Amino acid sequence: RKIPDSMDFKAAAGFAMVYTTSYYALKQRAQLQPGETLLVLGASGGVGLAAVELGKLMGARVIAAASSDEKLDFVKHLNPDEVINYSVDELKEKVKMLTAGRGADVIYDPVGGDLFDQCCRCINWNGRLLVIGFTSGRIPEYKANLALLKGSSMVGVFLGRFRKEEPLEYENNFQQLLNMYDEGKLNPIVTKSFPMEDFVAAFNVFTERKVMGKVTLEIKAE
């Protein structure tokens, strides 16, 4: 796909995967509606930032959650309605407090592990729990009795399969995202760029879980 004239290479590197993943998750999988409460875990990462940004554009009340105040400060330029530091606050109780006990309507979870377990207990009636990934390292188990009691759904988000099975819908999503970018509604953020020869340092930023926004590798022209 040709990069639009309005988009530079760094923005393009931080655009396609994160925005198409988050848009597919919120639009097709969760069918997010205006006025619903969207909880985004890992909100300072690439897909998390995109989910916060798109959630606001879709008219949701967005709660951005991350593991440090530094990461939450980074997210605040997107104007989430509420923020949660889940290294300090218990996620389940904080979400319930912010939603008058109801819980979130849609939960965007790229983290998994213990946070997923808490999400199952702070989701609203008819809620949708989006499984994006497992950056915590632990693939959690879903308690079927909680789905029954809350009328909730666990919904998988696999962009590669979506692109293969529904290519026209994928392309339609991509074009809508490009239109949003051209209209100044989306702002892909690349916070660190490394020359290709420093790829180990770039990889360490990920393994140490210090990433905010996107990290790119630059290939010099011969």
Task: For every predicted segment, state its role.
Residues 114-185, 218-222:
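Glycine-rich phosphate-binding loop and adjacent beta-alpha segment
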Residues 90-101:
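Short amphipathic alpha-helix with an adjacent loop that forms part of the alpha/beta core around
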Residues 13-89:
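Mid-domain Rossmann-like dinucleotide-binding core that forms the NAD(H)/NADP(H) cofactor-binding site
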